[in-house]
């Protein structure tokens, strides 16, 4: 199993120390109900080699060895990493292995990063962090501490495998809880919520919970699906959206900024809009499932398979 005690020690003397009132018990309860494959995945993750010669988190997530692994060892590493499929967020370059993930998450980071308040020395929360790709990029920007939350057991084990291959780097930590399970800490300088809002049945509650984690004046980075339209336009799919069951509300940018104002955020502004392309989300050998090409109308890629507007995403910044 994955040991969270080093994280408890890290935050014990920090302004996150109040979290220790609830977190250890929550994680004990989480382990009791974890996925039946969690122990197997965790064993794979925690047995990864931990001695890279150097790491690069500035323009990619990379761990380099002075000498290439012998081919047999490299193939065994690939075999073990593929036991943790599907790999959705990345890519990773680890000990000579290129994990070519479904999403080119570096594309999103290139869209987001230029607009952010500098992350250097900040304490950061990444909500719905997946396997933690963007957390490592935040570390690469000299963040003081990055905490990701995502309740998915496989993502936790992918994150721990990457952490090991990066030399057991402790500047980022993934906690397998949902945002609604966190006590309001008001302790993070920057809070990210990327690709989460449209999965929430109550988006305003989600925004309020994000605000409760920020220090006064802290920065929210909200990246989500949007539609074209004015302040009154919000898409509520009748059934599925791009084959996803759990998509509830997709607002226009104007509607989304209005939501943020209602929650009490200040200086809400849209800094980027982009249509999701087949270059950014696609099937690879590290993902056996369907991907974006299967979710779009084969005769008109401006629409989803259900006839709704194809995925378009916006980055919104606001301050608590």
From Swiss-Prot:
Q: Which domain of life is it from?
A: Bacteria
Q: Which Pfam families match?
A: Methyltransf_9
What this protein catalyses is: carboxy-S-adenosyl-L-methionine + 5-hydroxyuridine(34) in tRNA = 5-carboxymethoxyuridine(34) in tRNA + S-adenosyl-L-homocysteine + H(+)
EC assignment: the record states 2.5.1.-
Q: Which GO terms describe its molecular function?
A: methyltransferase activity; transferase activity, transferring alkyl or aryl (other than methyl) groups
This protein's UniProt keywords: Transferase, tRNA processing
GO terms (BP aspect):
tRNA wobble uridine modification
Q: Which InterPro entries match?
A: CmoB (IPR010017), Mo5U34_MeTrfas-like (IPR027555), SAM-dependent_MTases_sf (IPR029063)
Binding positions (carboxy-S-adenosyl-L-methionine): 89, 103, 108, 128, 150-152, 179-180, 194, 198, 313
Entry's family note: Belongs to the class I-like SAM-binding methyltransferase superfamily. CmoB family.
Q: How does it assemble?
A: Homotetramer.
The entry's function note states: Catalyzes carboxymethyl transfer from carboxy-S-adenosyl-L-methionine (Cx-SAM) to 5-hydroxyuridine (ho5U) to form 5-carboxymethoxyuridine (cmo5U) at position 34 in tRNAs.
The protein's name is: tRNA U34 carboxymethyltransferase
């Amino acid at each position: 199993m994955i040991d969270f005690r080093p994280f408890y020690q890290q935050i014990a003397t920090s302004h996150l120390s109040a979290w220790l009132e609830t977190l250890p018990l929550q994680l004990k309860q989480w382990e009791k109900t974890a996925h039946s494959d969690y122990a197997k995945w965790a064993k794979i993750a925690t047995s990864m080699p931990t001695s890279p010669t150097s790491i690069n988190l500035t323009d990619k997530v990379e761990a380099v060895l002075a000498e290439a692994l012998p081919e047999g060892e490299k193939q065994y590493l690939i075999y073990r990493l593929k036991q943790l499929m599907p790999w959705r967020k990345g890519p990773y370059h680890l000990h000579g292995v290129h994990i070519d993930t479904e999403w080119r998450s570096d594309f999103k980071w290139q869209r987001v990063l230029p607009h952010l308040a500098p992350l250097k020395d900040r304490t950061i929360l990444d909500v719905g962090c997946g396997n933690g790709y963007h957390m490592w990029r935040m570390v690469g920007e000299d963040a003081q501490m990055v905490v990701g939350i995502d309740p998915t057991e496989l993502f936790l084990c992918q994150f721990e495998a990457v952490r090991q291959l990066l030399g057991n780097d402790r500047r980022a930590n993934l906690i397998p809880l949902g945002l609604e399970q966190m006590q309001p800490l008001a302790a993070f300088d920057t809070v990210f919520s990327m690709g989460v809002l449209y999965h929430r049945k109550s988006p305003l509650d989600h925004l309020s919970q994000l605000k409760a984690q920020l220090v006064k004046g802290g920065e929210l980075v909200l990246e989500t699906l949007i539609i074209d339209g004015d302040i009154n336009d919000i898409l509520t799919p009748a059934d599925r959206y791009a084959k996803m069951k759990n998509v509830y509300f997709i607002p226009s940018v104007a509607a989304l900024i209005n939501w943020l104002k209602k929650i009490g955020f200040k200086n809400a502004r849209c800094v980027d809009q982009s249509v999701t392309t087949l270059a950014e989300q696609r099937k690879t050998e590290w993902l056996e499932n369907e991907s974006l090409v299967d979710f779009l109308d084969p005769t008109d890629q401006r629409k989803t398979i259900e006839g709704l507007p194809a995925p378009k995403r916006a980055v919104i910044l606001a301050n608590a």
